[in-house]
């Protein structure tokens, strides 16, 4: 089933995007920061969410990992 129609998969994809964008911004800030509008601006926004809500995103990733490993 597509990740767009399965809520659990959609949350996994969003969390992975947030974590990936925040990590890439820490390695290559100019790559993410030069595009703040349009479609590429979505990745800048995801990186900002990952930086500002870092403890909450980390907790959500741990909970998601637990559910993927032991619950599904």
From Swiss-Prot:
Glycans are attached at residue 35. GO terms for biological process: intracellular transport; protein secretion. The lineage of its organism: Eukaryota, Metazoa, Ecdysozoa, Arthropoda, Hexapoda. It is a single-pass type I membrane protein. It comes from the Eukaryota. Kish means 'small' in Hungarian. The chain crosses the membrane at residues 54-71. Keywords: Endoplasmic reticulum, Glycoprotein, Golgi apparatus, Membrane, Signal, Transmembrane, Transmembrane helix. It comes from Drosophila melanogaster. Residues 1-26 form the signal peptide. GO terms for cellular component: endoplasmic reticulum; endoplasmic reticulum membrane; Golgi apparatus; Golgi membrane. This is Protein kish. Residues 72 are cytoplasmic. Residues 27-53 are extracellular. InterPro entries: KISH_domain, Ksh1. It is found in: Golgi apparatus membrane; Endoplasmic reticulum membrane. Its main location: Golgi. Belongs to the KISH family. PANTHER family: PROTEIN KISH-A. Involved in the early part of the secretory pathway.
